[in-house]
From Swiss-Prot:
Gene Ontology CC annotation, any one: endoplasmic reticulum membrane
Spans through the membrane: 430-450
Annotated organism of origin: Botryococcus braunii (Green alga)
PROSITE patterns: SQUALEN_PHYTOEN_SYN_1 (PS01044), SQUALEN_PHYTOEN_SYN_2 (PS01045)
Subcellular location: Endoplasmic reticulum membrane
Any single biological process term in GO: sterol biosynthetic process
UniProt membrane topology term: Single-pass membrane protein
Family of this protein: Belongs to the phytoene/squalene synthase family.
Protein's name according to its UniProt entry: Squalene synthase BSS
GO molecular function annotation: metal ion binding; squalene synthase [NAD(P)H] activity
Lineage of source species: Eukaryota, Viridiplantae, Chlorophyta, core chlorophytes, Trebouxiophyceae
Gene label: BSS
């Protein structure tokens, strides 16, 4: 049924066909499979706990793959501990605070999590530790520091519970995602592929994390509120308290109107980070690092657009509020330069603006929503005016390669057919035949396999 649905969607959206095929290729053949057992486990479990991040991590420059892979797995393990509502607070809080010490302890392992892959990650955690200890001292220092800061922040909020104010909400998101942006910036600089100026823009790194985290928190309402043995609640009381006495009330269809107003205000709050994300991405110098940063941000804006004024958030399941596979693939393979990023953000902002004016014109937060969208549009239009679109150049090169390979294959068969089997020595005939097929296959590879975009000049914020 899934393949049939994808086939129908491809016919309806033919511009998504090639990106989907490229994504399938990356998923099947782009996975890193180290011979070393411990590294092999790390990349295997990475592909299981996060397919989307796994793809972009494995497309990073070689010197960054292991550090970022381990960084992700360490924080995923920490997040699994925080999310496990079966762990008593008296046990969880010290574990969160001390987790940064566990990442260098070869004997540490534990049972936690509600999904088999997360359980397996923590059960076989010594393999992650083994690879962590092979990283450079600077990389280990960065990962340990961010883990410590995140763990302490998570522990603080075990005590605090539901964030009261938007400031509390921002602080929580800083601890669980903003510091990740800071750590990644430090790893980029430590690799030598990014100038140190990036680490001086900590506020922008923080906005990158907050934009992603808030999108996830909004989308995951239904899953979090129904968590057992106790719900997880991250929406700030300052927002939902305007519309309900309890966050769980939004599940009741009788409260749909209030739920939608609350949801739209939550989306509005997340939108204020988008302009800063564009500023951060304009500072990235290495094209592969750019892809790594840009793709999740584009997906987040797309998902946020789906969440806006969408009551499915409160009725579930989470999969109901998800970008189509074709849309995901198209965004993934067209978010490879600043021109494309400005274009995607502008497109999302313009579509949301139309919905604000038609669907939610009476919404209590719509004026603020439109203000944020106008800022995003202005930043994108200014960015488009000063950057070059090289998308067509890449497409033209790919089409030229595919056309040339096809022409050569056709010419070869026509040539051999005209000559006849006895006019050429068998060796030359066979060589010509297989050489033409090889060139044709290479042309197909050039057309489908993801390329490395050319570096962009750094833009002023």
């Amino acid at each position: 049924m899934g393949m049939l649905r994808w086939g129908v969607e491809s016919l309806q959206n033919p511009d998504e066909l090639i990106p989907v095929l490229r994504m399938i290729y990356a998923d099947k053949f782009g996975k890193i499979k180290p011979k070393d057992e411990d590294r092999g486990f790390c990349y295997e479990i990475l592909n299981l706990v996060s397919r989307s991040f796994a793809i972009v991590i494995q497309q990073l420059p070689a010197q960054l793959r292991d550090p970022v892979c381990i960084f992700y797995l360490v924080l995923r393990a920490l997040d699994t501990v925080e999310d496990d509502m079966k762990i008593a607070a008296t046990t969880k809080i010290p574990l969160l605070r001390d987790f940064y010490e566990k990442i260098s302890d070869r004997s540490f392992r534990m049972t936690a999590g509600d999904q088999k892959d997360y359980i397996r990650l923590l059960d076989q955690y010594p393999k992650v530790t083994s690879v962590f200890l092979k990283l450079t001292p600077r990389e280990q220092e960065i990962i340990a520091d961010i883990t410590k800061r995140m763990g302490n922040g998570m522990a603080d909020f075990v005590h605090k519970g539901v964030p009261d104010t938007v400031g509390d909400y921002d602080l929580y998101c800083h601890y669980v995602a903003g510091v990740v942006g800071l750590g990644l910036s430090q790893l980029f600089v430590a690799s030598g592929l990014q100038s140190p100026s990036l680490t001086r823009s900590e506020d922008l790194s923080n906005h990158m994390g907050l934009f992603l985290q808030k999108t996830n928190i909004i989308r995951d309402y239904f899953e979090d509120i129904n968590e057992l043995p106790a719900p997880r609640m991250f929406w700030p009381r300052e927002i939902w308290g305007k519309y309900a006495n309890n966050l769980a009330e939004f599940k009741d269809p009788a409260n749909k109107a209030a739920a939608m107003c609350c949801l739209n205000e939550m989306v509005t709050d997340a939108l204020r980070h988008a302009v800063y994300c564009l500023q951060y991405m304009s500072m990235i110098e290495d094209p592969q690092i750019f892809n790594f940063c840009a793709i999740p941000q584009t997906m987040a804006f797309g998902t946020l657009s789906l969440c806006y004024n969408n009551y499915t958030i409160f009725t579930g399941p989470k999969a109901a509020v998800k970008l189509r596979r074709g849309t995901t693939a198209k965004l993934m393979y067209t978010s490879n330069n600043m021109f494309a990023m400005y274009r995607h953000f502008l497109n999302f902002a313009e579509k949301l603006e139309v919905r604000c004016n038609t669907e939610t014109s009476e919404d209590p937060s719509v004026t603020t929503t439109l203000e944020h969208l106008h800022k995003i549009k202005a930043a994108c239009k200014a960015g488009l005016a000063r950057t070059k679109d090289d998308t067509f150049d890449e497409l033209r090169s790919r089409l030229l390669a595919l056309t040339g390979g096809s022409f050569y294959l056709a010419w070869t068969y026509n040539f051999l057919d005209l000559r006849g089997p006895g006019d050429l020595p068998t060796f030359l005939s066979v060589t010509q035949h297989w050489w033409s097929i090889l060139i044709f296959l290479i042309s197909i590879a050039v057309f489908f396999i993801p390329s490395r975009p050319s570096p962009r000049p750094t833009l002023s914020a």
